[in-house]
Amino acid sequence: MARRYLLEFEKPLVELEKQIEQIRELARDSEVDVSQQLLQLETLAARRREEIFSALTPAEKIQVARHPQRPSTLDFIQMFCEDWIELHGDRNCSDDSALIGGIARIEDIPVLLIGQQKGRDTKENVARNFGMAKPSGYRKALRLMNHADKFNLPIISFIDTPGAYAGLLAEEQGQGEAIAVNLREMFRIKVPIIATVIGEGGSGGALGIGVADRLLMFEHSVYTVASPEACASILWRDAAKAPDAAAALKITGSDLLTLGIVDEVIKEPAGGNNWAPLQAGEALKTSILRHLTELSTLSEHKLRDNRYKKFRQIGSFLELSSQEEQLIT
């Protein structure tokens, strides 16, 4: 079994994990029945994980969202999709491996899937550019979404990126323009679009495939206009204040649900999706199918109209009168 990568706030579980592994090795190497001891320790570890993860701060949720063993776009596709065929290239200049796409079936429903893809180790992350798509990636995504629109395929996007790639070449190739065109065209698409934040959803890089009829996110995923580190550097000239920025940015599922930005927060297994990826995949599949069923009853006009209204309402606020302000203070 691969060694689990434990985050700083999970360190209280280290000793329990060692004991569990020792008992498993004992069971493999001998005929001694240790099932009862193993069950007790696993139950205790699960309870402590539940206690830790039910009280995470926004800064700690970011660590969970960036966990190297957290299920990726391809992991989820392999879990609950059939007949997956990846499609390549933007038909302009290149094929960006940081943003993947293709067609598949979910419970016999043909769909188009797009999403950012990170790597598991340094070599894979370099090849995938750490999930940071270039203009060719967003243009590839748009090409595939137009394909889905033409053949009446619902679109499912998986968001997992720290942001769009901000290198010099990407800017020269029109990074901002590529994302802006995606935003415009996704409002025009006539088929249902469901976006899911499976890890971190950062800045315009996330929004470039995030205009949707339904926006879902996992319990420990984050969705933010800028990374807390960048926000702290801009506002306070001090990246060490990232935890303060994370709290102020309202990046968690519960905050975004309250603000009306996301439509559903999907509960994660105790310890996060990396502890029970198959369980997480089943939860995501169930949620996607439920929303697809609801959206399939709407006309093309109603879909686009609702999608536009959904985004127009983001950022709305109430302005209090002087009398109301006095009552509050």
Curated annotation (Swiss-Prot):
Its main location: cytoplasm. It catalyses: N(6)-carboxybiotinyl-L-lysyl-[protein] + acetyl-CoA = N(6)-biotinyl-L-lysyl-[protein] + malonyl-CoA. GO terms for cellular component: acetyl-CoA carboxylase complex. Disulfide bonds: none annotated. It is found in: Cytoplasm. Its EC number is 2.1.3.15. The keyword ATP-binding applies. One of its GO terms (molecular function) is carboxyl- or carbamoyltransferase activity. The keyword Metal-binding does not apply. Pathway: Lipid metabolism; malonyl-CoA biosynthesis; malonyl-CoA from acetyl-CoA: step 1/1. Belongs to the AccA family. Component of the acetyl coenzyme A carboxylase (ACC) complex. First, biotin carboxylase catalyzes the carboxylation of biotin on its carrier protein (BCCP) and then the CO(2) group is transferred by the carboxyltransferase to acetyl-CoA to form malonyl-CoA. PANTHER family: ACETYL-COENZYME A CARBOXYLASE CARBOXYL TRANSFERASE SUBUNIT ALPHA (PTHR42853), ACETYL-COENZYME A CARBOXYLASE CARBOXYL TRANSFERASE SUBUNIT ALPHA, CHLOROPLASTIC (PTHR42853:SF3). This is Acetyl-coenzyme A carboxylase carboxyl transferase subunit alpha. It comes from Prochlorococcus marinus (strain SARG / CCMP1375 / SS120).
